[in-house]
């Protein structure tokens, strides 16, 4: 996937807000990359554009050579299922009237055009892979923990057999134990060849999972590169400021660089 000089503007005239400004990036097959920045930096808007959910005001997204947005449609040549997204609030993205099994089975039927029994069997397999057993699979979203809801959301996304998964702040609304489970799950998906774009303000999560990182401020990429290089030798003051907020040696080193 290539993001080429993408900008996104909301509104017009004097009230126009440019949320994303001339951003470019490349995502390789089977690669984990991170987009990091504070709230309001534009990272979630860019993720929605990459997922085909928000058209850019300028620039283009290319997936396997095709322009994702063409006219009023997104993802030409049957590539719609290949890029999926999970959101920060799993409760808001799940139908409150459906239990986990039904929610995932519904997605399986949409993407695979199979019968009810086959869809439920596939859904059970996906949920079990996510660490959701049959008893929990029969619970509705309000009966599940935040971490369980997020894993049901991931199972729904995987029902399309995607090659790219965009995850927008997937760990921000869950506890530390659930975060660890979800990150372990993502590592397994990477081992299976899935490409992951992790959007987060949590630098620890970004460092744990990604190989390359893009640092975003006010809609602009201010720094990018190999994750370890950016974290250990940041060049931009904004990146240093973000890193300085981390407890421990990495944050201490970043704070020292800010004082220079």
Stretches with model-predicted labels:
Residues 224-225:
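ABC ATPase "signature
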Residues 206-208:
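A short, surface-exposed alpha-helical micro-motif characterized by mixed small hydrophobic
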Residues 14, 68-84, 98, 102, ...:
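ABC ATPase NBD coupling module
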């Amino acid at each position: 996937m290539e993001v080429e000089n993408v900008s996104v503007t909301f509104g017009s005239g004097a009230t126009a807000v440019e949320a994303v400004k001339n951003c470019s990036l490349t995502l390789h097959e089977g690669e984990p990359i991170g987009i990091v920045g504070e709230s309001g930096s534009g990272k979630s808007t860019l993720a929605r554009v990459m997922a085909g959910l928000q058209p850019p005001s300028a620039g283009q997204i290319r997936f396997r050579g095709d322009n994702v947005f063409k006219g009023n449609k997104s993802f030409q040549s049957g590539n719609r299922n290949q890029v999926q997204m999970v959101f920060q609030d799993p409760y808001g993205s799940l139908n409150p009237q459906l239990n986990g099994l039904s929610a995932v089975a519904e997605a399986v039927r949409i993407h695979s055009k199979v019968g009810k029994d086959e869809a439920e069997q596939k859904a059970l397999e996906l949920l079990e892979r996510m660490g959701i057993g049959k008893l929990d699979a029969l619970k509705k979203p309000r009966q599940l923990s935040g971490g369980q809801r997020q894993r049901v959301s991931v199972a729904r996304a995987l029902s399309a057999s995607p090659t790219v998964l965009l995850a927008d702040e997937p760990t921000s609304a869950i506890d530390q134990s659930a975060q660890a489970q979800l990150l372990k799950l993502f590592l397994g998906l990477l081992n299976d060849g899935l490409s992951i774009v992790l959007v987060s303000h949590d630098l620890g999560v970004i460092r744990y999972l990604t190989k390359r990182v893009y640092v975003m401020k006010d809609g602009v990429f201010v720094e990018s590169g190999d994750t370890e290089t950016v974290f250990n030798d940041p060049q931009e003051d904004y990146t240093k400021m973000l890193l300085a907020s981390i407890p421990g040696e990495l944050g201490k080193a970043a704070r020292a660089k800010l004082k220079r």
